[in-house]
Amino acid sequence: MRKRMFALLVAVAVAGLAGTTIAPAGAATGLPAKASTGASPPGLGGFPALPCQDGAVAGAGPIKHVIYLQFDNVHLQRNLAGVPSDLEQMPHLRDFITSNGTLLSNDHTVLISHTANGILTSLTSLYPDRQGQAVSNSYRYYKPDGTSGVGVSFAYWTDSVFDPTTPTPTDTSYNMLTADGRNDPAPWVPFTRAGCNWGAVGTANTVLENIGPDVPKVFGPGSPEAAEVASDPGQAFADFVGIAVHCAKGAAMCSTGNHGRPDVLPDEPGGYDGYQALFGHKYVAPQITSSLPLKDLSGNVIQDASGHVGFPGFDGMFPSVTLSYIAQMQEHGVPVTFGYLSDAHDDHGVAGEIHKSYGPGEAGYVQQLRSYDRAFAAFLTRLERDGITKDNTLFVITTEEEDHFVGGTPLNPGCDGVTTPCQWTHVDCTAPSADCSHNVTEVNANLRGLLATQTGNTTPFQVHADMAPAFYLDGNPAPDAPITRQFERDVGSLTATNPITGQTDRLSDKLVDRVGMDALHMVTGDPLRTPTFVDFLDDDYFGFTGPPDCASPCVTAPGSWSHATFAWNHGGYTPDIVRIWAGVVGPGVQHRRDGAGRRDRPGRPRCGRCPGCSRRGSRRRWGATTTLARSHRSWCSPVGR
């Protein structure tokens, strides 16, 4: 999932909405340069305030709307050479970006590369050490007795550590926290302070994430909403989770009469009193449509798999759903909208109730991408009809990370997916076989069992299960403690026989202790959630903790569709995971091709003294999660556009 477009987004949107001049980006990346004129109130990085009134843009600047869309694991890179990538199979979206703006193909996500970490970095402009989510989508925290508990990365912005196993976790620090332990500044504040309503559709931690602590916290423990949680939790989830509008001060949309609640941000720099927000489909939908129930872009009522009308769940955020919410908000006084979209390589059922992985080019995968493309075609046509276009709207479309596909080869190797569907097997494997060589699944490794049987090490520990498992040794020993060093050596020696390839693999690729994690922006302001070390595994493997033996096989490839399956591995640092893409379209955005041109060959970039530019032969403009958040808006331009 994509990173640091947010600071750029604020900069460009503020400049455009305020009627300032966006200077040519020099030898640019295709992104707008910093605004050159206008007043500069504090807290907005030197950019002028947005002239919104009650949620409607009122300035003379070219930008009237901001639409930020972030996919979960949607790929620009091909996962199988003969099969077009996700973005190639969505031509309406891809052509919109490449024909009207810039498609950056050499951006990079953060470590550990997961959904929460990627999105939250993109919302905050901060590396994980300054926003609290170095290990995600969950993490562990040390308790006073030396054992560790579970913290969930997805929790509302002002929540403390959310441990679903207890209402009173011993770690009471903010889930989203700065390096000095305060609550991170919220991403909607630059817009709402300037008078613009800000909408969120499934966007991590800007919406209520659960009906446990979040609903009573926002609405009150004795509220009708809390009573609904107790009496009908399924409907309560659909009513209150996943959708929000954070309003400008005094905006009618978020009035108390419309069920607006105080938008409380206790540590916001400069204070944040008097603002209100709407939380949940139940209260947002009536403000953005006069025709209930709200429908997706295909004309279907938005509901979950059980028929609860409302938010369908975070794994049911197909483009037809997310883009419907976004369009309705934009048409009804919410000019700044952020949306999350589910991945395309898994079968999520009706609304995320199942999880079955497809292989590249498999029929269901290709069909799902076609439906995604149809949704974008309908969305862009609708916006055009509304007068929301590339000439007055800043579009940012990106992903939070890409993936490493774990699987064999298709049964029909010459397939392209589009005209000839690729055929794969979906079976459970514990040993190499003909079927397993064509399987679609990651390889699961029981780290506790392998440690005990291969090294005899039974030191108590827990992990955040992952392609890059974070180890938490009981007692929280120091990095240089003998028990830590021996444990690390033993973990580094583990091997496994891959049921798909038949090869014996060394499990560990790179092992990083706390000193290394600090260098990688992975040590946060909460020392209790810092792991003992992180092990970046061979990228085909997913490490977890099971029994301390291998009576049941410690290494399996569970690909049968009789249960949930996972084949798209991420968390690690390999290029197929961390190299991501971002598309930018709008006023002031230069139309650039990001890639090899006729004279753009290795070793010959035209590059001066500027950030984000390498003299080592990269054909693409290099970006990182926070690179675009810098005050520099002018990068190098390779020869040959």
What are these language model-derived features?
Residues G61-L76, I97, S122, V336-L341, ...:
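Beta-strand elements within well-structured catalytic alpha/beta cores of enzymes
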Residues R2-A28:
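Secretory targeting and sorting signals
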Residues T203-P335, D343:
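Extended, H/D-rich, highly charged conserved domains that either
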Residues I112-N117, T124, R130-H259, V264, ...:
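Secreted, luminal/periplasmic, and some membrane-associated catalytic domains
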Residues F47-Q53, S306-E331, R374-R382, T484-G525:
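A Trp-anchored, charged/polar loop motif used as the substrate-binding/catalytic surface
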Residues P62-I67, S99-S105, R130, V150, ...:
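Loop/turn elements at helix/coil->beta-strand transitions in domains of secreted/extracellular proteins
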